Amino acid sequence: MKSLLKGINQVIPVTGEKWAALSEAYAKCIAEHLTPETRWLDAGTGSRLLEEDLDALENWLVQRSGMTVGMDIRVTQHLNIRSLVGGSVYDLPFADRTFDLVTCNVVMEHLGQPEKALAEVARVLVRGGALIVNTPNLWNYGVLANAIFSKILPEQWRLGLVRATDSREPEDIFPVRYRANTLRRLHSLLRANGLKVHRATVLPQPRPYFRKTAQVEKLLMTLTPGVRLLVCAHKET
C-alpha cells in the first residue's frame, strides 16, 4: 500500500493549494481505490465530481477507473462522467454487488434517512468493496451554525447565507439534515450496515468563510474541530 500511495502522489495532478485542500484530500482517497477494472458509482453526483474547479484532477480520476457511473435525482449533464443515471440513494437502480467503489461527496448531510441510503450502498457493493464519504463535520463552528440556521430561519434566508460563501449554482444547493455528520454517528450507521471503517479523518478548514470576520473565525478554527469528515469503509460480507 505504501508503494501504491507513493506512486499515486507522484502522478496525481494536484495543485497543493490551500483552497483546493479538501477536494484534493478526497481525490487522493478515491485514487487509492481505482484500477482499470474498478466499477465506480458516484452517488449524488451533481454536475461534477469535486467541489472546486479542478478539471484536470477530475478527468484523471475518471480515466483511471474501468467504469464510472454518476447517479442523482436529476442529472442532465456532467463535466466528466458520460454514463449518467437518474435515481434515489434510497432505492439505487442497480443490481446487488454491481460496484467495487461507491463515493458520496457532500451528500450525507442532505439525507433524512441516511441509514436507508447506506443499506442501499452496501447492497450494490461487492464483498470487500469500498465506500468513501466526504461530508461536513457537524461540530465545526460554521457547519453547526448552518445547522442551527436551518432550524430557525426560513429556508430562503439560509440559502442566501450559504450562497454568500459558496460558488455553487442555486439549483445545486439543497436543504440540510445533518443526521450522519459526526464521526460517532457515521461509524455507527456504517457498522450497522456491514461496512467496516478503515480510515476516518477530520479535515481542517482551509480558510475563514468571510473576510470581514476572518480574525474571529481564525480563533474559532482553533477552538472547534475540522470542517470535513473523510471516511473510507469496506463491505465485510
For each feature predicted by the language model, list its residue ranges:
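Short histidine/acidic/glycine/proline-rich micro-motifs that form metal-
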Residues: G16-E17, G46-L49, V176
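A short alpha-helix capping/helix-coil boundary motif
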Residues: G7-N9, F99-D100, A164-S167
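Class I SAM-dependent methyltransferase Rossmann-like catalytic core
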Residues: M1-H33
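S-adenosyl-L-methionine-dependent methyltransferase catalytic module, highlighting the catalytic core
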Residues: E115-E120, A130-E236
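Short secondary-structure boundary/capping segments within folded domains
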Residues: I30-H33, W60, L220-L223
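Soluble or luminal CAZymes and related metallo-dependent hydrolases
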Residues: K18-Y26, D53, Q113, Y178-T182, ...
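Conserved SAM-binding loop
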Residues: H33, T38-V143, L230-K235
